[in-house]
């Protein structure tokens, strides 16, 4: 067992309403002829506002992938440092207490990786174990928490952290309209989050009162590589998004969840908190229907989507933070759910104190 000691979400300073973002997209010359579908997709996304790492007027001038990636490195490190410092502060721990740092991103490239840059800025120990995760996309928030637990099960005195940074707005330089890209333009935004967790002995020493991490389950689905992802080229990241995505969720997720819960003597009716990635209205509805949940079960997921959009891997960690702030009764199980490129799911079983 391991224990979540602190969760902190960080958002860039530029916040825009969905209407402002829609108007900006339809004003791009290459979007001529797409105005109706852009407005329709943006209106149906259930997103009210989003945060961006740059002022809106800067994006039309950003046409080079290399230039965008330089900005990504600078801003991602800034947000990652802010998120990790906040999570450590919530945990009552110092940077030098960290034994393991996992970083997750899919919206930019950095060598040395983000973890090395964040470690230097915050003053982590020279012997900190660094684990950069790239390519997991939306599933990486839950997968990263699961990997924290994997380490801490064997290190009861240890402390480990996950930092997720996604700057989706920087994946569009030189962008030409595609249907998946238009869907993404309605949903994705920028942000970061960090989770600090401790092994069971260290958690007792510091009085960590976040939920316990009990177990996790991964499932990589067959013949699904093109369900979701990016094609990376000279113009940046081109979104791959199958129209069958919701159907894949409905096909697999119900059995994944019921089997995993049953292995712990639980069913969906026992779960007091659903910590679910806000992938978009169709995905949230598919999860609700396939698990036969009440309309209120994913309230915090819907709220996160509306307030900040889809932050890829960081989103489920924002929902985790919101759930900790509004916890279920003591002793209640919780289930973290995220899905992403592969195509795959990651489930993390939690228990509230």
From Swiss-Prot:
User: Which UniProt key words apply to this protein?
Assistant: Acyltransferase, Fatty acid metabolism, Lipid metabolism, Transferase
Q: InterPro entries this protein is in? A: Chalcone/stilbene_synt_C, Chalcone/stilbene_synt_N, Polyketide_synthase_type-III, Thiolase-like
Q: In which pathway does it act?
A: Lipid metabolism; fatty acid biosynthesis
One GO term under biological process is: DIM/DIP cell wall layer assembly
The answer to whether UniProt assigns keyword Heme to this entry is: no
Phenotype upon knockout is: Abolishes the production of phthiocerol dimycocerosate (DIM) on the cell envelope.
* Any one Gene Ontology cellular component term annotated for this protein: plasma membrane
**Which EC numbers characterise this protein's activity in its record?**
2.3.1.-
Q: Which domain of life is it from?
A: Bacteria
> Which enzyme class, named as a word?
transferase
Q: Which Pfam families match?
A: Chal_sti_synt_C, Chal_sti_synt_N
Which Gene Ontology molecular-function terms are recorded?
Answer: acyltransferase activity, transferring groups other than amino-acyl groups
- Which catalytic residues are annotated? 138
Similarity-based family: Belongs to the thiolase-like superfamily. Chalcone/stilbene synthases family.
Q: What does this protein do?
A: Could catalyze the elongation of hydroxybenzoyl-CoA as well as elongation of the aliphatic precursor involved in the synthesis of phthiocerol dimycocerosate (DIM).
Q: How does it assemble?
A: Homodimer.
Question: What is the designated name of this protein?
Answer: Polyketide synthase-like Pks10
Native source species = Mycobacterium tuberculosis (strain ATCC 25618 / H37Rv)
């Amino acid at each position: 067992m391991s224990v979540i000691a602190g969760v902190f979400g960080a958002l860039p300073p530029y916040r825009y309403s969905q209407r402002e973002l829609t108007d900006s997209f339809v004003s791009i010359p290459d979007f001529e002829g797409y105005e109706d579908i852009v407005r329709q997709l943006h209106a149906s996304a259930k997103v009210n506002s989003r945060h961006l790492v740059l002022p809106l007027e800067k994006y039309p001038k950003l046409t080079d992938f290399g230039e965008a990636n330089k900005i990504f490195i600078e801003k991602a490190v800034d947000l990652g440092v802010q998120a990790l410092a906040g999570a450590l502060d919530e945990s009552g721990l110092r940077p030098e207490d960290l034994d393991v740092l996992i970083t997750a991103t899919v919206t930019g490239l950095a060598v040395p990786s983000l973890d090395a840059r964040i470690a230097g800025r915050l003053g982590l120990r020279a012997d900190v174990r660094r684990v950069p995760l790239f390519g997991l996309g939306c599933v990486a928030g839950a997968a990263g928490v699961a990997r924290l637990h994997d380490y801490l099960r064997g290190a009861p005195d240890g402390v480990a952290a996950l930092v997720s940074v996604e700057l989706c707005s920087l994946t569009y330089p030189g962008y030409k309209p595609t249907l998946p890209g238009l869907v993404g333009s309605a949903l994705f935004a920028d942000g970061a989050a960090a989770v600090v967790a401790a092994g069971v002995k260290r958690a007792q020493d510091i009085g960590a009162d976040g939920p316990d991490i009990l177990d996790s389950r991964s499932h990589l689905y067959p013949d699904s590589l093109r369900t979701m992802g990016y094609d990376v080229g000279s113009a940046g990241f081109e979104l791959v998004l199958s129209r069958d995505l919701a159907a894949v969720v409905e096909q697999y997720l119900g059995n994944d969840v019921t089997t995993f819960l049953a292995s712990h003597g639980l069913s969906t009716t026992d779960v007091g908190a659903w910590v679910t990635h806000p992938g978009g209205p169709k995905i949230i509805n598919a999860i609700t229907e396939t698990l036969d949940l009440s309309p209120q079960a994913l309230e915090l997921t819907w709220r996160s989507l509306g307030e900040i959009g889809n932050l890829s891997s960081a989103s489920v960690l924002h929902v985790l933070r919101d759930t900790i702030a509004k916890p279920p009764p003591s002793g209640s199980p919780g289930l973290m759910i995220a899905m992403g490129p592969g195509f795959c799911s990651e489930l993390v079983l939690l228990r509230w104190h």
